[in-house]
């Protein structure tokens, strides 16, 4: 495990409990709370400008730092909107790429992690939707609509805290960790106070494969709630494109030794997904989020197959390693009416914008 990955694991463990480290860092969390409240007030009072796009905007983000499963929700949402007749476009910060002063806009497989960032490239490859990236999401939205005027709804990948762009729908994605110890950074894992969840339109909880939690029921009060499980699909060979059922990798006759690697916000969730599918990868290599694959981390691994996430796969294509297989995941929601409900909200927003 890389040092930065070890530090992240250390922080995650402490963020689940209100122990000595949280107590020690509490004064710094008070500064975070002051900064968050001050910044929000500046936007609410008009001291900072807010861009209003001419189409509805849906933000999918979180208040828990790190990976909670936002990207699969973005992909599922874009696909669901397209099925319902919308032409969605996506905006993102473009983390992992050097964007420069001007937004970068592209569509489909022309996007690469180096040019547009890891998650934007993955979303573009999975959906074919146009994607614009820039740290200032208002600029990204303007560039997106300029180059793709047919876009009639913008989905923001992350950006719940990016208040410089007006939004019509907010979806918060969390996982079984919930709000951790409930404290703001650095004493806890939260970017904003836990009460922020009361103001969003919907909360999707990404459940672990073996979670025994009772499915969240949709409620008529407060945010609409749904559970999500990420179900693995057939593995795809990175070099040939061939597909094989995931069960094949549990067959010692086909693959005597299977390893796994993940450079995502929560690698253990990916490994747990593989184990829940009946696989027993060894070793499980937890890499830092947004890992740079220009140098292979797999040379010391003795295995017949190495299973990686889709986010890692798009960065591993330049590696000459025939052992690499991508394991895509599909988001399955407990609320079958969620996307119809979201579409109804979007139509209301579009009508209000047109007036």
Curated annotation (Swiss-Prot):
Any GO MF annotation of the entry: tetraacyldisaccharide 4'-kinase activity
EC class: transferase
Keyword Nucleotide-binding: yes
Lineage: superkingdom: Bacteria
Cysteine pairs bridged by disulfides in the record: none
Key words, A-Z: ATP-binding, Kinase, Lipid A biosynthesis, Lipid biosynthesis, Lipid metabolism, Nucleotide-binding, Transferase
One GO-annotated biological process of the protein: lipid A biosynthetic process
Catalyzed reactions: a lipid A disaccharide + ATP = a lipid IVA + ADP + H(+)
Residue numbers spanned by region Disordered: 206-226
Residues noted as binding ATP in the record, renumbered to the chain: 64-71
UniProt pathway: Glycolipid biosynthesis; lipid IV(A) biosynthesis; lipid IV(A) from (3R)-3-hydroxytetradecanoyl-[acyl-carrier-protein] and UDP-N-acetyl-alpha-D-glucosamine: step 6/6
Entry EC number(s): 2.7.1.130
Leader peptide range in chain numbering: none
Record-level GO cellular component terms: plasma membrane
Membrane spanning residue stretches: none
Low complexity biased stretches: 208-222
Entry function: Transfers the gamma-phosphate of ATP to the 4'-position of a tetraacyldisaccharide 1-phosphate intermediate (termed DS-1-P) to form tetraacyldisaccharide 1,4'-bis-phosphate (lipid IVA).
Family, similarity comment: Belongs to the LpxK family.
Listed name of the protein: Tetraacyldisaccharide 4'-kinase
